[in-house]
Curated annotation (Swiss-Prot):
The keyword Cell inner membrane does not apply. Its main location: other. It is found in: Early endosome; Recycling endosome; Membrane. Atypical chemokine receptor that controls chemokine levels and localization via high-affinity chemokine binding that is uncoupled from classic ligand-driven signal transduction cascades, resulting instead in chemokine sequestration, degradation, or transcytosis. Also known as interceptor (internalizing receptor) or chemokine-scavenging receptor or chemokine decoy receptor. Has a promiscuous chemokine-binding profile, interacting with inflammatory chemokines of both the CXC and the CC subfamilies but not with homeostatic chemokines. The lineage of its organism: Eukaryota, Metazoa, Chordata, Craniata, Vertebrata. GO terms for cellular component: early endosome; membrane; recycling endosome. Glycans are attached at residues 16, 27, 33. This is Atypical chemokine receptor 1. The gene is ACKR1.
Amino acid sequence: MGNCLHQAELSPSTENSSQLNLEDLWNFSYDGNDSFPEIDYDASLEAAAPCHSCNLLDDSSLPFFILASVLGILASSTVLFLLFRPLFRWQLCPGWPVLAQLAVGSTLFSIVVPILAPGLGNTRSSAPCSLGYCVWYGSAFAQALLLGCHASLGPKLGAGQVPGLTLGLSVGLWGAAALLTLPITLASDASDGLCTPIYSTELKALQATHTVACFAIFVLLPLGLFGAKGLKKVLGMGPGPWMNILWVWFIFWWPHGVVLGLDFLVRSKLLLLPTCLAQQVLDLLLNLAEALAIVHCVATPLLLALFCHQATRTLVPSLPLPERWSSPVDTLGSKS
């Protein structure tokens, strides 16, 4: 919400216009024995100065964006190659089609990171910015929904007990993610050479919709999965959602959903911050949450690799040799 600037200095005319309280002027009588009340003009000017925040993700952060993009593309491409490699043991991972789509989502996110990076030029149009935010949040929404699906269906994915998962459910999840990106796509533009969301009264409904979508998917979805897991365990109703290393993904986006909601409340004046320091802390948290979300494109392939390694290490030795290469693709194909 602003560059790292010193507080604005007021002009001499502004300094001279600092006046007494109206009540003091009303009660003031011109008498030689009376004296003017003492006023701390420096404190008044300090309070009147605008509040500026230091933006961490400015032009100097361009190497971070580029490095995250390159590493994310390389790592995700490697995971995709191993998942689709013929006769490779990762094809025995439970729900490997969902895992492949997670890698695709991470790759798409990595590709658009440079589009939204600062410091790449000052002649950006609104079209690349809108497309960048669409893919940015669309891939993140899709990954979150796929993780929720993977956790809910659990080991059933590996047994081929859900025939329509590969096509029908995947199309539905990606379609829902695309629809959820419409608000931020329509409410983003290039400003001063930077791709940024537009905050205006006319677009307040779009901003509210986007904030609610982020809060629901990045915050409420993982909390719901944890709650369902604990509730079913307490009531003895079954194992509940399938917990695994992939749930770490939500750590990278959970702060973004929370801080984005707080920022919207402040902009809408539903939540008033008492001091300039509080506003600066909120802006800092917004930058840190965005940086953490960017790091997910590098962490996601590593989480997928670790999950597949753990799953196949315990699964492959227990299968006879001919059954080791009967992947879930064959099982789903035989049922269709």
